[in-house]
């Protein structure tokens, strides 16, 4: 299933920087797991051990153009001219909210094990 970037923006309550059209199929939180950069949305998560924001440059070079961030890069317009940055207070909360909204679209029982 694909989501338009506009739909993602509305679902997570983000402020969008960038005007490139995008369809999102894959959500990414670990830059080592990148498979389909053209349709990937990267969530720059901050943890005790790392900060996903430091992988934006590498992912951009590898073809990712859509990022959910807690802070936009200072050199955003110069170094990432074809990127879309979705600015939120917490990328983790945005990921959780998107997962919740996606789940709400289906009327399928959830089974926990």
Task: Identify the residue ranges that each predicted region occupies.
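N-terminal leader/targeting and accessory segments in enzymes
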Residues: 1-97
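Walker A (P-loop) phosphate-binding motif
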Residues: 99-113
